[in-house]
Amino acid sequence: MSGRGKQGGKARAKAKSRSSRAGLQFPVGRVHRLLRKGNYAERVGAGAPVYMAAVLEYLTAEILELAGNAARDNKKTRIIPRHLQLAVRNDEELNKLLGGVTIAQGGVLPNIQAVLLPKKTESHKPGKNK
């Protein structure tokens, strides 16, 4: 035995997910699989699912932040579809992005046309009735 050859080679490094490498919570591997299976293109590059997962994570965080604020404004600790609806419809950009989306159990934004409101009568100013 000359001491050459395999001598307990290096242990394989612990597997690290693509999500953790990119610093994301959303699953990059699952997004990659869905892009491949969805027949969106013949081939899918390595960076595409990372970018897609990052965009989805950002949009989700943005909506949840606004919905959490809406829940807090209504003195609630749980986000319900109504809070999601209020969050999306009160934000100009999200409303444009999700304009054609119906949120189940979301309700509508409170809105009363100005024409339907009672007219204000001019109050008499004191001191000018002489």
UniProtKB/Swiss-Prot annotation:
| Keyword Phosphoprotein on entry | yes
N6-(2-hydroxyisobutyryl)lysine modifications at: 6, 10, 37, 75-76, 96, 119
Q: List residues, modification Phosphothreonine.
A: 121
- What are the annotated GO cellular component locations? nucleosome; nucleus
Please give the residue positions where the record annotates the modification N6-crotonyllysine. 37, 119-120
Protein's name according to its UniProt entry: Histone H2A type 2-B
Q: Mark the residues carrying the PTM N6-(beta-hydroxybutyryl)lysine.
A: 6, 37, 120
Is the Acetylation keyword given for this protein? yes
**Keywords for this protein:** Acetylation, Chromosome, Citrullination, DNA-binding, Hydroxylation, Isopeptide bond, Methylation, Nucleosome core, Nucleus, Phosphoprotein, Ubl conjugation
SUPFAM superfamilies in alphabetical order: Histone-fold
Source organism:
Mus musculus (Mouse)
Sites of the Glycyl lysine isopeptide (Lys-Gly) (interchain with G-Cter in ubiquitin) crosslink: 14, 16, 120
Positions of modified residues (N6-glutaryllysine): 96, 119-120
Record text on subunit structure and interactions:
The nucleosome is a histone octamer containing two molecules each of H2A, H2B, H3 and H4 assembled in one H3-H4 heterotetramer and two H2A-H2B heterodimers. The octamer wraps approximately 147 bp of DNA.
Database matches in CDD domains = HFD_H2A (cd00074)
Q: SMART domains attached here? A: H2A
| Gene giving rise to this polypeptide | H2ac21
Q: Which residues carry this modification: Phosphoserine?
A: 2
